[in-house]
From Swiss-Prot:
UniProtKB keywords: Acetylation, Cytoplasm, DNA-binding, Metal-binding, Nucleus, Phosphoprotein, Transcription, Transcription regulation, Ubl conjugation, Zinc
Keyword Lyase found: no
Any one GO MF annotation of this record: metal ion binding
Positions where N6-acetyllysine occurs in the chain: 19
Origin species: Pongo abelii (Sumatran orangutan)
Gene Ontology cellular-component annotations: cytoplasm; heteromeric SMAD protein complex; nucleus; transcription regulator complex
Domain (MH1) ranges: 10-176
UniProt-recorded name of the protein: Mothers against decapentaplegic homolog 2
Biological process annotations from GO: activin receptor signaling pathway; anterior/posterior pattern specification; cell fate commitment; intracellular signal transduction; mesoderm formation; odontoblast differentiation; paraxial mesoderm morphogenesis; positive regulation of DNA-templated transcription
Residues recorded as bearing Phosphoserine in the entry: 240, 245, 250, 255, 458, 460, 464-465, 467
Keyword Transcription regulation: yes
């Protein structure tokens, strides 16, 4: 390996020999970038080897990697190694590097008050799973520990297991098809749809006294995050829903009781672009729609879109832009990171300023009014959509008729403002009064609704937030 530094211990060379390589060279300058990456990987392995030599767990790590066996023992390091790995999102505007790790040019202090002294930050189990198993790993949301891991990240022990074969990739659950009766009555026009644009929504600071009930320990993010991973109680979701999580619902339990109807299964399929994002300044649409194909993307205020994972608002011009909008745009900074993993959508605030989210799906989970706007502080993340919850609501709404299904259209649209919030507690009471905001259209659920409505005998009108 050309990047190996002098005096590299043999065990480090052996472990680096098992490193998984990402496909492609990264285009122009890829050779230099790959060289820097290999040097960093060597440093990461050296640091881990140094820690494990002190505890006698080095042999177990090498055994796990060479045999690729999940039945090996836990390989642990102290979970308080924040001075090297970092356990929270930084509150400074720095570059997110090509490996998905935070890069720092100098010492910075994280949200939990600890001093960061390394040039990159990341969760240790994510770093080593990326190094030895999945080079395309983006986030801890994509990982879950195996059952026999005693020091899994989500258990929040004093030690954390970094055995890459003690973690699995989260798989996207298969949604059961919705059984839809074919109705003979054809509607000539769509019913009115309240998309909350002109209403004055309530406000909340998540989690503000809300404690989601769960039957298992959620894989929560590290300190400095707000998280609500895990399912909530059925009472919070909907008083009339059957007991059990959406994952346990089947086409039989979700289908209409009258089996004499002509029932047709309507299945969910993943689109090429999981969401489309439109940017607005006040009530004016600015720029073209961004179509997201990658499971992780950022919407930021910068001007250098390096790849398909960035929507840079700094590039967009608007002749009608006023001073308030200009000032707000300067504070967007690193903006928001959106993840689509395992049928769930997460929003993580990377900016120094809060973001404000209106997600009817999230609001229903917590028993809030559908139009409630939730403030997400810097360094925090929130689950803003869950495909399984939506599938359960869709199957239930089919029994209630066309209009009930059509009203679910608004659940597939998420609005998000930067820096400035809106609602009853703010001077700006509607989203179109905020200087900078975006609207996400979740294409998979919207296309599913299209197919269900068509099967029910609806007019051939595509679902959108503006329908």
């Amino acid at each position: 390996m050309s990047s190996i530094l002098p005096f590299t211990p043999p065990v480090v060379k052996r472990l680096l020999g098992w490193k998984k390589s990402a496909g492609g060279s990264g285009g122009a300058g890829g050779g230099e970038q790959n060289g820097q990456e290999e040097k960093w990987c060597e440093k990461a392995v050296k640091s881990l080897v140094k820690k494990l030599k002190k505890t006698g767990r080095l042999d177990e790590l090498e055994k796990a990697i060479t045999t690729q066996n999940c039945n090996t023992k836990c390989v642990t390091i102290p979970s308080t190694c924040s001075e090297i790995w970092g356990l929270s999102t930084p509150n400074t505007i720095d570059q997110w590097d090509t490996t998905g790790l935070y890069s720092f040019s100098e010492q910075t202090r994280s949200l939990d008050g600890r001093l960061q002294v390394s040039h990159r930050k990341g969760l240790p189990h994510v770093i080593y799973c990326r190094l030895w198993r999945w080079p395309d790993l983006h986030s801890h949301h994509e990982l879950k520990a195996i059952e026999n891991c005693e020091y899994a990240f989500n258990l929040k022990e004093d030690e954390v297991c970094v055995n890459p074969y003690h973690y699995q990739r989260v798989e996207t659950p298969v949604l059961p098809p919705v059984l839809v009766p074919r109705h003979t009555e054809i509607l000539t026009e769509l019913p009115p749809l309240d998309d909350y644009t002109h209403s004055i929504p309530e406000n909340t600071n998540f989690p503000a006294g809300i404690e989601p009930q769960s039957n298992y320990i959620p894989e929560t993010p590290p300190p400095g995050y707000i998280s609500e991973d895990g399912e909530t109680s059925d009472q919070q979701l909907n008083q009339s829903m059957d007991t059990g999580s959406p994952a346990e619902l089947s086409p039989t339990t979700l289908s209409p009781v009258n089996h004499s109807l002509d029932l047709q299964p309507v299945t969910y399929s993943e689109p090429a672009f999981w969401c489309s994002i439109a940017y607005y300044e006040l009530n004016q649409r600015v720029g073209e729609t961004f179509h997201a194909s990658q499971p992780s993307l950022t919407v930021d205020g910068f001007t250098d879109p390096s790849n398909s994972e960035r929507f840079c608002l700094g590039l967009l011009s608007n002749v009608n832009r006023n001073a308030t909008v200009e000032m707000t745009r300067r504070h967007i900074g690193r903006g928001v990171r959106l993840y689509y993993i395992g049928g769930e959508v997460f929003a993580e605030c990377l900016s120094d300023s809060a973001i404000f989210v209106q997600s009817p799906n999230c609001n229903q989970r917590y028993g809030w009014h559908p139009a409630t706007v939730c403030k997400i502080p810097p360094g925090c993340n929130l689950k803003i959509f869950n495909n399984q919850e939506f599938a359960a609501l869709l199957a239930q709404s089919v029994n209630q008729g066309f209009e009930a299904v059509y009203q679910l259209t608004r659940m597939c649209t998420i609005r998000m403002s930067f820096v400035k919030g809106w609602g009853a507690e703010y001077r700006r009471q509607t989203v179109t009064s905020t200087p900078c905001w975006i609207e996400l259209h979740l294409n998979g659920p919207l296309q599913w609704l299209d197919k269900v409505l068509t099967q029910m005998g609806s007019p051939s009108v595509r679902c959108s937030s503006m329908s």
